[in-house]
Amino acid sequence: TTISFISLPGHSFDSYGILATSSDGKKTLFAGDAIFPRLEIGKYNLPFTLNYSNYLSSLDKISNLGQLDWCIPGHGDFITKNVEETIEINKISLYEIETCIVRLLKTNQQLSTDVMVQKVANIFDIKMSVRQYALVHFTVNCFLSTLRNNGILKIEIIDNMPYWKLKEQKQ
């Protein structure tokens, strides 16, 4: 059996997965929080993310490992079939968050971070406790920062409050 450590950041910083390949070629990935089973995504609606771009890259890395016989995520059931489908579902959930934020800003012109967090939570039907608020707030901030870094959003400080708006695209 061969053991490999694979950097899988995104959900958290410096996350690693462990790939075990047996002598007969069977592959098991201990993925940690780099991938969520379908039921977990449905349960939380908004997967906690520290770095959206890295999260997508980590999902691509998992996809590039080839056929996995077992994928052991940090939460939920083991994934024994349709790993590629599960990867796509994870990506779709991330794209849905991005799309939600962009649509909110198209409709509202500009929003403060806190109002954005509230609106995203309402759209994804999340009933927030204090703990849940912290997780959702961090995730929404991650997406806002990534969209800003990618030239899609801009931020302005108005009366000591951060406001987000779509960056005007040159035609």
Residues covered by each model-derived region:
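C-terminal regulatory/interaction regions
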Residues: 103-171
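Metallo-beta-lactamase
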Residues: 2-98
